[in-house]
Design a protein with these regions (language model features):
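Caspase-like (clan CD) cysteine peptidase catalytic core
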Residues: 21, 76-101, 106-148
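Hydrophobic anchor at the start of a short beta-strand
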Residues: 65-67, 96
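Positively charged n-region of N-terminal signal peptides that target proteins for export
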Residues: 1-5
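Bacterial N-terminal signal peptides
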Residues: 7-15
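Glycine- and acidic-residue-enriched helix-capping/strand-helix junction motifs
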Residues: 35-53
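Short beta->alpha junction loops
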Residues: 68-76
Length: 148
């Protein structure tokens, strides 16, 4: 679901990137050091902040107003706050590019809206790797249901 959404957004972006009258906004999220907030976090480190740096340069050349959230600032609360703020800035005809360079993880679908029985989720820096009944049940993950 998230992959499809990203592909659609990228295709739309490519098709209209040279439109001169439209306002262009980008929100980029990148996490490299998943241990920065919690040394016991079991997620492997990746190169998300490098992706954000490279994509920021490209998008600014295309006239985008770029907001980036990286490392310890890439918490669930902050990502959702920035997404909400973005929805207030855009207007009809705006181009919006969303980019997430972080881990993803499937979650059992609880509301029955997924054919395959799984919700997809983004993994912010404050989300543990393991589901533990009564301790951590995915509350910091950002599921596709939340993004829809």
């Amino acid at each position: 679901m998230i992959r499809r959404l990203i592909i659609i957004v990228v295709c739309v972006l490519i098709c209209v990137a040279n439109s001169y009258a439209q306002k262009k906004y980008a929100l980029l999220v990148g996490i490299s050091d998943y241990h920065a907030l919690n040394k016991a976090n079991e997620w492997n480190n990746i190169h998300g902040t490098n992706d954000v740096s490279l994509i920021t340069q490209l998008l600014k050349k295309q006239g985008f107003n770029v907001s980036a959230i990286t490392e310890t600032k890439a918490t669930r609360a902050n990502i959702l706050k920035q997404l909400k703020q973005l929805t207030h800035r855009v207007s009809k005809g705006s181009i919006v590019y969303l980019h997430f360079s972080c881990h993803g993880q499937p979650f059992e679908d609880k509301n029955g809206d997924e054919e395959d029985g799984w919700d997809e989720s983004l993994v912010p820096i404050d989300a543990p790797i393991a589901y533990k009944k009564g301790t951590y049940e995915g509350k910091n993950h950002i599921t596709d249901d939340v993004l829809a």
